[in-house]
Amino acid sequence: MNITIISVGKLKEKYLKLGIDEYIKRLTRYAKLNIIEIPDEKAPENLSSAEEQIVKNKEGEGILKNIKDGMYVIALDLKGKMLSSEELADKLQSLGVAGNSNIAFIIGGSLGLSEDVLKRADYKLCFSPMTFPHQLMKLILLEQIYRGLRIIKGEPYHK
């Protein structure tokens, strides 16, 4: 399985980088992993909705350029479907069985994802109705992918 994580923003926090590096190392036993970071656009506090759309569209263009033909795209979105770890494992396994071995997970910037990215998504996944920093979300996503792949292999995991 080939998994690509496309996220907006460069990771700056050392403690998150350490956790992400750990899960990247663990995941190499189960999948080929590629992480792509798209530069985030400057977004001052008081943007109008039109200015927010411009920022999301610019970030979205960068995301869409990195989605290859044939990739199954899972966008992280507050309006997406919430799954348990076991259900995510089932989803990943069913994608592999259906011949979708190239999966891209998309993490938007602080303003979310553009409409074009959401339209391109084959599936929308929500981890929680709460909002998380997108850098932290990358770590959470990697942990859940790792957990899901261990579930698929029938290996023990912490419940």
UniProtKB/Swiss-Prot annotation:
Domain of life: Bacteria
Predominant location category: cytoplasm
EC number: 2.1.1.177
Record keywords, A-Z: Cytoplasm, Methyltransferase, rRNA processing, S-adenosyl-L-methionine, Transferase
Binding-site residues for S-adenosyl-L-methionine, renumbered to this chain: 76, 108, 127-132
GO molecular function, one term: rRNA (pseudouridine-N3-)-methyltransferase activity
Family the entry assigns: Belongs to the RNA methyltransferase RlmH family.
Descriptive protein name: Ribosomal RNA large subunit methyltransferase H
Encoding gene (name): rlmH
